[in-house]
């Protein structure tokens, strides 16, 4: 009997979601943590179907706010991903305008998960077969559109969030990162594919 498992961890601020696909592969969306609990450390102790010997088949970073990448060093040390989805095209002046570039978390993220790291496209043949018709689709606003509609640097980063739709059997699960209402409205307006994924 095939099934999917979904964990939404209570990490206070930020986010950490884990998905076990029907074929047993692990996908993690964001790597937040609380003061006393690291979902990444726990996930690293569990059994998963390995993809090319990686326990973590895919890591999605919705947007680079520190609370969404708080546990990135643990990812590197204990649960390094085979592939990562993250924005490479952002205005980094805005991303770090609050001084977050001074944090070890942001420094580590930029050094280990930005080009030239993880910078080649993964071919379809090299992607995991999640199994049983399970589909993971991510959508985002173009950088200039996010800049245009956002009143503050923080809103800009939020509005660059990947919105991920999990489609499995009769379920549609939307994980929108921290996209703000004006960002979601703009994304729905410009992405027919996102509308279809939600409504199909």
Q: Over which residues does each language-model region extend?
A:
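Core dinuclear metal-dependent hydrolase active-site scaffold
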Residues: 1-54, 119-199
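Short, aromatic/basic amphipathic alpha-helical patches
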Residues: 41-44, 96-115
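Short internal beta-strands
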Residues: 55, 82-92
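Metallo-beta-lactamase
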Residues: 55-67, 200
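Metal-dependent catalytic neighborhoods of phosphoester/phosphodiester hydrolases
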Residues: 69-79, 94-106
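Proline-aspartate-enriched helix->loop->beta-strand connector
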Residues: 80-81, 200
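Long, structured stretches of catalytic cores involved in phosphate-ester chemistry, encompassing
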Residues: 90, 95, 100, 193-200
């Amino acid at each position: 009997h095939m099934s999917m498992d979904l964990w939404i961890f209570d990490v206070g601020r930020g986010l950490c979601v884990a998905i076990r696909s029907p074929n047993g592969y692990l996908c993690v969306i964001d790597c937040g943590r609380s003061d006393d609990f690291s979902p990444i450390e726990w996930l690293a102790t569990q059994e998963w179907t390995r993809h090319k010997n990686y326990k973590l088949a895919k890591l999605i970073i919705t947007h680079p706010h520190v609370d969404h990448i708080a546990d990135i060093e643990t990812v590197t040390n204990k649960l390094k991903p085979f592939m990562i989805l993250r924005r490479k095209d952002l205005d980094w002046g805005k991303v770090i305008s609050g001084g977050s570039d001074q944090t070890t978390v942001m420094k580590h993220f930029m050094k280990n998960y930005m080009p030239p790291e993880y910078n080649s496209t993964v071919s379809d043949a090299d992607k995991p077969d999640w199994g049983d018709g399970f589909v993971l689709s991510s959508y985002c606003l173009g950088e200039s559109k996010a800049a245009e509609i956002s009143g503050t640097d923080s809103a800009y980063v939020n509005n660059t969030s990947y919105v991920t739709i999990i489609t499995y059997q009769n379920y549609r699960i939307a994980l929108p990162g921290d996209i703000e209402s004006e960002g979601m409205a703009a994304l729905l307006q410009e992405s027919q594919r996102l509308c279809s994924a939600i409504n199909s």
